[in-house]
From Swiss-Prot:
It catalyses: Endonucleolytic cleavage of RNA, removing 5'-extranucleotides from tRNA precursor. The keyword Zinc applies. It is found in: Nucleus. The keyword Disulfide bond does not apply. Zn(2+) binds at C90, C93, C115, C117. The gene is RPR2. It comes from Saccharomyces cerevisiae (strain ATCC 204508 / S288c). GO terms for cellular component: nucleolar ribonuclease P complex. This is Ribonuclease P protein subunit RPR2.
Length: 144
């Protein structure tokens, strides 16, 4: 990592911007929780797609239950979900917002997505076109 100083301790490496360079972790903590959350999201997405193809609501309660379980497990294990996943889930009824009931762009530059339960989720899309969330930015440990 760095060179040893006079006291025998490692001197930290700092780049030209003043950022402390830290090696990425060798393992991911709570990897089994992430696998479980990923599986629940994928199976819910599969059930939602199966419902759309069959044009029936037979799979809807099961898909919503998977999303609700994913939310409860992430809270219980204190594991944060990525913002891209949070944007696709209705907080009230735990549905995936892939086929919204109503979709509109408001006059203030926000995208309004209405779920089947009537909940409206707003995304500010006109404020800053160059805005990226932390997980979408270049140079963080998630992209390494």
């Amino acid at each position: 990592m760095g060179k040893k100083a006079h006291g025998g301790k490692m001197k930290p490496e700092i780049d030209e911007n003043g950022t402390l360079l830290v090696p990425p972790p060798r393992t991911i903590a709570n990897q089994d929780h992430f696998h479980r959350l990923n599986y629940l999201y994928q199976i819910s997405a599969y059930q939602t797609r199966a419902r759309q193809k069959a044009r029936t609501d037979a799979h809807t309660p099961l898909a919503r239950n998977y999303i609700k379980s994913m939310d409860l497990i992430s809270k219980k294990t204190k594991t944060s979900l990525l913002p891209t996943i949070k944007r696709t889930i209705c907080k009230k009824c735990h549905r995936l917002l892939w086929t919204p009931k109503k979709l509109e762009i408001t006059s203030d530059g926000a995208l309004s997505v209405m779920c089947g339960c009537g909940t409206v989720k707003r995304f500010n899309i006109g404020a800053d076109p160059n805005y990226r969330t932390y997980s979408e930015r270049e140079g963080n440990l998630l992209n390494s």
